[in-house]
């Protein structure tokens, strides 16, 4: 099995029908791709429905074909179904009737589940449960499940807790697809609380998976955090577009290098909301992106000063007093 998980690395220059946009961002809450310049929805992230069968002749395809959709890494038996035939299944006109039943691997059909099988069942169930709580799209669930399976195949789960590898797999899959979930967010959704030792353990597991499975993690962009903040705080679309423009201007001014993308996005949304006369507290925004109020405040001041919009913001009501 290939260890590298593919991801789309071309955020600009995409086309959807006749729509062309050079500044595309993802709304992870709705699973949409949006043009940051116009606010138009130009596509969505959907798992492909194409066949996963590799065959070169009609006879070979007939032998290999399974019934149902594409393989599902998030299902214990990959969501594969088999066609079982019987002479009685032939109808009066000789039309073959098929019973579609889940295909259980032969090695498992005659004996109870092993500890490895139980481990996988528990892990996949936990991945689905945590992803559901966090509203992650199906493609992230599938990639997290694939990562966990590959980790098992390479023996990376031995000596480590299921929860640790599951959290690390979900975090890696989120990073691959540009979702702004932090390790802390995922651990909290899984366990309800976060302690320093658990976070260190999950961080170690994440680094192990990335290194040993050769997972390519794209650099996080602050733009990808914007729609998460907008959705969480119920802000209008024009605030998101304004925030993305502020981020773009900040990048041109050299303000984004080495800065936490969540903090930058939070400050940009705070600024954009103020410009449109909408008040949201730095505390509210900091909570959504998982940074401190101080981080939001510092980025806000840097951006406002560099863009020369301090006076404009003062006229709109100014920064909240810390």
Curated annotation (Swiss-Prot):
Name of a matching Pfam family: TFIIB
GO cellular component, one term: transcription preinitiation complex
GO biological process: transcription preinitiation complex assembly
Domain of life: Archaea
Keywords: Repeat, Transcription, Transcription regulation
UniProt-listed CDD domains: CYCLIN_TFIIB_archaea_like_rpt1, CYCLIN_TFIIB_archaea_like_rpt2
Family per similarity comment: Belongs to the TFIIB family.
Function description: Stabilizes TBP binding to an archaeal box-A promoter. Also responsible for recruiting RNA polymerase II to the pre-initiation complex (DNA-TBP-TFIIB).
Name of the protein: Transcription initiation factor IIB
Origin organism lineage: Archaea, Thermoproteota, Thermoprotei, Desulfurococcales, Desulfurococcaceae
Gene coding for it: tfb
